[in-house]
Every structure is written in C-alpha cells, then in structure tokens.
C-alpha cells in the first residue's frame, strides 16, 4: 500500500503507472473509454438518422444560437486546459496550484452545465421543443443530454477527489485517480467537439 509521497523528491514522472494497481486501473480505464466511445457513436448514428424527422416542428436552423454554443464550447475547452495545468502542477509538487487549477476546472464545468440547462429551457419554453415533439427532438435531447450527464458525473468525481486530497494528501494510490479523472474530462471535451460539429454546425448549415 503506497504511503504519502515525499514532496521533496516529488512524484514519479508517471504516477498513474508507478504501482501495479495504478497500471491496472489506468489500463482498465482505457477499456472503459472504449465502451463509452461505442455508446456515443451509437447515439451519434441515431441522431444523424433521425435529424430530418422534425414532424413539422423546429429544426436545428430554427433553434441554434451559435454564439451561445460557442461560449459553451470555449468554457469546456478551457476547462480541459486547466485540468492539464493541474496535472503539471502536481508533477512539480505544487499541490496548492494543482488544487486551484482543478477548482477552476470545476467552475468552468459548472458554467457549461448552467448554459446547457438554459439552452434546454429556452428551447422548451420559447419553441415548444420538448423531448417528444419529434424524432429529431428525442435524438437531440438524448445525445446532448447524455453528454451533459457525463459532464455532471465528471464534475462530481473531481470534487470528491479534491476533498479527499484536502484531507489525506496525494499518495501513489490516489495520484493515478487524478490522472484518470483528467483523462475522463478530456474525453468529455472531445465528445463535445463532435457534438458542436455534428449537431450544431451541421444543423445550422442544413
């Protein structure tokens, strides 16, 4: 069982693989992300197949405000950068900076979710665009909502880790968990780039 890391010597260059347990968790998580990729690919395929089924209701071109979606995209991409900076800080034994960058990541993620909730509310109230309005609506809310649920889970995960660090410090046992959480967060960001392109840009372009 790994104890607290001697910060005078620093963490190993790859703390996520410094122990056998860490290696197994890291490898297992890559398999998990593979399954997540298949899940999202299925939802993307369903959306592409149903996006024309508007049932005379609103289309993407009617709904989407690219300025709002662009702000959401920048928030999420910036949060990916701050999570990277947090990991760099941890490797340099600057755990205070790591905490700051991770909390900034959380704030940016929460802001993204806030805008997404506002977006959904706007569509429902102003356009009567509910989940059951059309096949397109169901596919839209399923795909974008699935991603939003992943963002919420990722934020919860990071917050739990930050609280655990505050109480117990970084160890060779929990350091890999920060790396895995960061990897998960980057995956969420990549998925959003595809959503931004396929759902919003292609939707506005017809």
Swiss-Prot record:
Ranges in a coiled coil: none
A GO MF label: cytochrome-c oxidase activity
Subcellular location: Cell membrane
Keywords assigned by UniProt, alphabetized: Cell membrane, Membrane, Translocase, Transmembrane, Transmembrane helix
Transmembrane segments: 26-46, 68-88, 97-117, 143-163, 185-205
Record lineage: Bacteria, Bacillati, Bacillota, Bacilli, Bacillales
Name of the top EC class for this enzyme: translocase
The keyword Transmembrane is assigned to this record: yes
PANTHER family: CYTOCHROME C OXIDASE SUBUNIT 3, CYTOCHROME C OXIDASE SUBUNIT III
SUPFAM superfamilies xref list: Cytochrome c oxidase subunit III-like (SSF81452)
Family: Belongs to the cytochrome c oxidase subunit 3 family.
Protein name: Cytochrome c oxidase subunit 3
An annotated GO cellular component: plasma membrane
Protein's organism: Alkalihalophilus pseudofirmus (strain ATCC BAA-2126 / JCM 17055 / OF4)
Reactions catalysed according to its record: 4 Fe(II)-[cytochrome c] + O2 + 8 H(+)(in) = 4 Fe(III)-[cytochrome c] + 2 H2O + 4 H(+)(out)
Gene name in the database record: ctaE
InterPro entries assigned to the protein according to its UniProt record, in alphabetical order: Cyt_c/ubiquinol_Oxase_su3 (IPR024791), Cyt_c_oxidase-like_su3 (IPR000298), Cyt_c_oxidase_su3-like_sf (IPR035973), Cyt_c_oxidase_su3_a-hlx (IPR013833), Ubiquinol_oxase_su3_dom (IPR033946)
């Amino acid at each position: 069982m790994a104890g607290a890391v001697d910060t005078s010597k620093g963490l190993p260059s790859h703390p996520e693989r410094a122990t056998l347990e860490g290696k197994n968790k890291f490898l297992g998580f890559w398999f998990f992300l593979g399954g997540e990729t298949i899940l999202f690919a299925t939802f993307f395929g369903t959306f592409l197949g149903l996006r024309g089924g508007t049932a005379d209701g609103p289309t993407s071109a009617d709904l989407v405000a690219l300025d709002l979606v662009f702000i959401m995209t920048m928030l999420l991409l910036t949060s990916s950068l701050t999570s990277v900076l947090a990991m760099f800080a941890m490797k340099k034994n600057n755990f205070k900076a790591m905490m700051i960058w991770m909390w900034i990541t959380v704030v940016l993620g929460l802001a993204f979710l806030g805008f997404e909730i506002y977006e959904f509310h706007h569509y429902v109230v102003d356009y009567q665009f509910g989940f059951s309005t059309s096949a397109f609506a169901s596919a839209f809310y399923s795909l974008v909502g699935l991603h939003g649920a992943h963002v919420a889970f990722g934020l919860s995960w990071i917050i739990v880790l930050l609280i655990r660090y505050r109480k117990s410090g970084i160890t060779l046992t929990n350091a890999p968990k920060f790396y895995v959480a960061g990897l998960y967060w980057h995956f969420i960001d990549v998925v959003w780039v595809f959503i931004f392109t396929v759902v919003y840009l292609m939707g506005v372009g017809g």
